[in-house]
Design a protein with these regions (language model features):
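Membrane-interface interhelical loops and short amphipathic "cap" helices
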Residues: 1-12, 64-93, 144-167, 188, ...
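Membrane-interfacial loop-to-helix junctions in multi-pass inner-membrane proteins
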Residues: 28-52, 115-136, 161, 184-200, ...
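Structural signature of hydrophobic alpha-helical transmembrane segments
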Residues: 13-19, 97-100, 160-173, 214, ...
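Central hydrophobic cores of alpha-helical transmembrane segments in multi-pass inner-membrane proteins
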Residues: 18-34, 105-114, 172-182, 320-328, ...
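Mature extracytoplasmic enzyme cores
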Residues: 1, 10-71, 76-77, 83, ...
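Hydrophobic alpha-helical membrane-insertion segments
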Residues: 48-61, 198-206, 275-286
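Contiguous transmembrane helix-bundle modules in multi-pass membrane proteins
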Residues: 163-170, 220-358
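Conserved active-site neighborhood of enzyme catalytic/cofactor-binding cores
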Residues: 131, 142-150, 156-158, 163-208, ...
């Protein structure tokens, strides 16, 4: 089975895996969306097709896995890196890529909604199942990667805040915000513009993760297949995707109809705060990951941002998120009386403080 998994152990093969998985997602959307309006399906498939064309061109022009090296080839063949001769290589990258590429579906539905001007609950209902599946695959991929790193010598335990780990964690954070926001948009018709923006950012961070992993611009214990020159192509694709999407968003989002109203103390408010915290955490991780690269590019020296920074920022923000989750689960839609929340939360709050102190 290493003969198969070795395909994505190198740069060219990993891009081929990306393209194949994207083709699988496109096929699944085409088959499962026959009951949706055909104009929407056409736009969704067109957007995904454009993304596929970009990666296919990248693969063929700079990273063709079909290049022949005859007659200059190793007599006994090229061995797979010993660290990669593990069952983790078989299951971890495909699951991770299923999540990365799967967010292209939510991105495509968001762009299709912007193009059609139909930013309503319908597009959220159509894209939410795909987003949930992509998020589940990415979660599984990250968990498998942590399990692999835990027992692999020299990889810093189950989580090291390594740049490549961060590259997969950022779309997971924003993707988590996205699946919650899609649920609210579908049920209550609110957060329409915000949800589209999250869909754009989630897929953009997936592309950024690919750039960080495959370009070699960041030092990582996971760096097995990197090429800075090829990274520029992915960076250009990333710039076109983000720039074009945000330009379309700026033009179309201003025409979105007024959303349903909700009070300051309501489930919608707590879910929005939940989203904001997750996005702030993702930005914090992005800053810690790219800051050394920025300083190096400006010739201001070389530094490394390690676990102390991430832990100092991550722990208080995620603690706040846990509190918001607890309150939001009890709060009611549209409006919630403060007295009701106090009555429901005072006992669990006291118990939580006591257990925390002990």
């Amino acid at each position: 089975y290493y003969k198969i998994s070795a395909i994505w152990g190198g740069h060219e093969g990993s891009l081929l895996l990306w393209v194949v998985i994207l083709g699988g997602w496109i096929y699944a959307v085409a088959v499962k969306s026959r009951n949706l309006p055909q104009d929407i399906v056409a736009r969704v498939l067109s957007v995904m097709g454009i993304v596929a064309v970009g990666f296919i061109l990248f693969t063929l022009l700079t990273s063709s896995p079909f290049e022949r090296h005859l007659p200059m080839y190793p007599q006994e063949g090229g061995d797979l890196n010993p660290l990669l001769q593990d069952i983790g290589l078989i299951i971890h990258p495909p699951m991770l890529y299923m999540g990365y590429v799967g967010f292209a579906v939510a991105f495509a539905f968001a762009i299709a909604a912007l193009l059609s001007g139909q930013l309503d609950a319908a597009w959220a209902r159509w894209s939410r199942p795909w987003t949930n599946v992509a998020w589940a695959f990415l979660t599984l991929g990250i968990a498998l990667g942590s399990w692999w790193a835990y027992y692999e010598l020299g990889w810093g335990g189950w989580w090291f805040w390594d740049p490549v780990e961060n590259a997969s964690f950022m779309p997971w954070l924003v993707g988590t915000a996205l699946i919650h926001s899609l649920a609210v948009t579908e049920k209550r018709g609110v957060f329409k513009s915000w949800t589209v923006l999250l869909a754009i950012f989630t897929f953009s961070l997936s592309l950024l993760g690919t750039f960080l992993v495959r370009s070699g611009v960041l030092t990582s214990v996971h760096a097995f297949a990197s090429d800075p020159e090829r990274g520029y192509f992915i960076l250009a694709l990333l710039a076109i995707t983000i720039g074009g999407s945000l330009l379309l968003y700026a033009i179309k989002a201003a025409h979105v109809k007024a959303e349903s109203s909700f009070e300051l103390v309501s489930r919608e408010s707590f879910l929005l705060l939940n989203n904001i915290v997750l996005v702030v955490v993702a930005l914090m991780v992005l800053l810690g990951t790219l800051y050394p690269l920025l300083l190096d590019a400006l010739q201001m020296g070389k530094i490394s941002v390690g676990a102390p920074y991430f832990n100092a920022m991550f722990i208080p923000l995620m603690s706040l998120l846990v509190v918001l989750m607890g309150i939001g689960a009890i709060a009611r839609w549209k409006a919630t009386k403060s007295e009701f929340l106090i009555k429901q939360l005072w006992l669990p709050g006291v118990l939580a403080v006591v257990v925390g102190v002990l």
